[in-house]
């Protein structure tokens, strides 16, 4: 009999340097996700990609130090907003975009 193993990767996560919108520190976010049994975590700051370099460097360092397993996934994404009218932004929708690979990351 085969079993389906479901893993959970949270996709709406922001960190401290993202417009002062969060108190999450990148290494702590990754370590906490691992301790909670998650298979990975995505960094999706609000309309900002500047945290991705620090994010990927932290992932590499934590794996080298064997603090997280090699198969732990640190995905890169972006939370974007869509509006109906650029001149009158009364209401907007949030969308999370996650890069599947390096081509997707360049597209973000």
Where are these regions (language model features)?
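Phosphodiester-processing cores and adjacent nucleic acid-binding clamps
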Residues: 1-108
